[in-house]
Amino acid sequence: MGSVNFITHADVLQLIAKRTAEDCIIFLSGPTSRKTPLSLLRMKDVIAVNGSVQYLLNNNVKPFLYLLTDIRFLHRRREDFYNFSRNSQFTIVNLDVYEQASVDDQKYIEENCLIIRSFYRREKGGFLKKIKFNILKRVHKALLISVPLSKRGRLAGFCKDISIGYCSCHTIAYTAIQVAYSLKYGRIICSGLDLTGSCPRFYDESTSPMPSELSKDLFKILPFFTFMRKNVSDLNIFNLSDDTAIHYDIIPYITASELEDEIYYDKIV
């Protein structure tokens, strides 16, 4: 495999130019996503992940952007990946998906998708890693990251510009938020950001189910959201979920009716 053409700053600017709304909805896989009105999804740009796209397509909602960071989905539901990608305006995959894809799939990704890369493989801290990221964040002001000296500790971070990389943390939701922030949406609205119980997905997985590991990884995930809230002062983000593990002090709750009322008011003003 030759060198990988990662997403560039010019690519990000093109995505920003193609936006059709000031707000975006990140359409995730949690059960409460079904409560998000279709009328609302049709009025905002939608960033959809994994298998959630099928619900949107079934209801004539075309995603602005399809995001995939789990190679298992491509391996187990290859036809769905192609369908979701072709029916979304843009597709972003991460380096893991690209590297572990077949030669044919790599060719499709190269020609039709944008590729992002995580700053790290593992979230462990350590002296050398701390030095590395202290240097990196001086070079890239968009990278916010805290790395503990001990290898037993876990780092936390957030990147404001996906053209230089992103900070991963066991949930695609966090990656999607960094994508949305990079695209400079005025408001980021999460749908289906639940992370409760066994973390089930709302869509049918009767064929090629993918076991969810979110519940056991929750203790690794939550510190990233806390870091985000403390360090990204201009992040305007809300959660539509009324059953979530993310405290509303971190991502404030907003109702669909509040958003619909705004749309109605804008129409009559």
UniProtKB/Swiss-Prot annotation:
EC number(s) recorded for this UniProt protein: 2.4.99.15
MF (Gene Ontology): transferase activity
Reactions accelerated catalytically: an alpha-Kdo-(2->4)-alpha-Kdo-(2->6)-lipid IVA + CMP-3-deoxy-beta-D-manno-octulosonate = an alpha-Kdo-(2->4)-alpha-Kdo-(2->4)-alpha-Kdo-(2->6)-lipid IVA + CMP + H(+)
Domain of life: Bacteria
Gene Ontology, cellular component aspect: cytoplasm
EC class (word): transferase
Pathway in which the depicted protein is active: Bacterial outer membrane biogenesis; LPS core biosynthesis
Protein function: Involved in the biosynthesis of the core oligosaccharide region of lipopolysaccharide (LPS). Required for the addition of 3-deoxy-D-manno-oct-2-ulosonic acid III (KdoIII) to the KdoII residue of the inner lipopolysaccharide core.
Protein name: Probable 3-deoxy-manno-octulosonic acid transferase
Organism of origin: Salmonella typhimurium (strain LT2 / SGSC1412 / ATCC 700720)
